[in-house]
Amino acid sequence: VAFHVVGGGLAGLSAAVALASAPGGHDVVLHEAAPRAGGRCRSWHDTELDVEIDNGTHALLGANPQALAYLARIGAEDRVHWLDGGIEFLDLRDGARWSIRGPADMLRPWRHGGSGAAREMALLLRLLVPGQGAAVPPGLAGATGLGRLAWDPLVRSIMNTAPGIAAAVPFAAALRRILRGGARGMRVGLARRSLADCLVDPALHLLARHGARLRLGARLREVRGGADGAPPVLHFDGEAVELARHDRAILALPPWDLARCAPGLAPDCAASPIVNLHAVLDMPDTGAGDIAFRGLVGGQVEWVLRRGRVASSTTSAAEALSGLSRAELHARLWPDMARALGLPPGARALRWRTIVERRATPVQDASFEACRPGIATAAANVLLAGDWVVPGLPCTIEAAIASGVAAADAALRSARTARE
């Protein structure tokens, strides 16, 4: 039995790891179009900055059971730095500072009562059990009360879609899990060195130990067959892989890439961008263990992560910024980053660059949520994985890993049935 996983992002990596680790030993091949694995969680040595950077400031939460299980499976638990003091926030409008360590801190504004607090409580209660097709109420992202505390960056970072547009069902699922987890569920975990060092390289080492094959630069061009009993054929550059009756393929690709090579398997969905600013600071290199993380409200930047002298910012649902030039982006983002880092007015970075991930996720509105396909396809030996696949979960690291594990489990079960 051969298992072909197409796509080396976290969905594909988690699927390949689950397949390679399963009892009995299996022939697992991971095909990735890029020169490195990792997808949107990749890391690389940037020649402009002369340092290693990540493709964004991705973070884990204590309320991410699938991600935590993945870390344990690949032996990377010690590569995560957990913030013990909660999430620090800064309001760029008036300099107010606060931290959120658990659900009680998120509810702090309501202790003071008033009509605004009562309105926000009603909105939150309605959000926790939303109707199908509902959007996250924009009132939770206002300039006062709970909206000021955390909701706007929380909605945008989880959904990469603005409040008022973001589908309420997946956001509510993530929110319920966070609230149920208490203070432990809200702990933030950050890669100590890089996303690749934490989430990608240990998985590749596990796959190599189990004899799995990694094919980099292997772009899937087309999927033929699979209907009316015809065997599916995966067409890569210069190679075609025909799936035998008991073989299985997991297509762990973004929806726009899947739509290109296998029309009909992915919904037609708009993309939502994320903008990052990376900067090398004028300070001594204090090493990978020196990590700071802060949320911002009232500005252009939502999150700032600093590892040693390398700082990175994230702005989600960044349609308004994605068309700007590098210089314009720097002019908008650097002042926010500098304030978050406590730098003096007029401070400059030694080197900087901006990165616009134009297709970071789909726009996660109600119409997208309604057409997510799930992992099964019409062909018994072709399955799907990806953060966008499974209904009811936001497009996050947790969803990507969960979909990969679910697809691997389904592939193992169906392959076993086909052999019997």
Task: Describe these PLM feature segments.
Residues 11, 36, 256:
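Conserved Rossmann-like nucleotide-cofactor binding loop
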Residues 39-63, 177:
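Glycine-rich active-site loop/strand segments that organize a redox cofactor
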Residues 43-45, 101-104, 303-420:
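Conserved flavin/dinucleotide-binding core of flavoenzymes
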Residues 64-176, 180-181, 185-186:
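Mobile amphipathic helical/loop "lid" adjacent to a hydrophobic cofactor/ligand pocket
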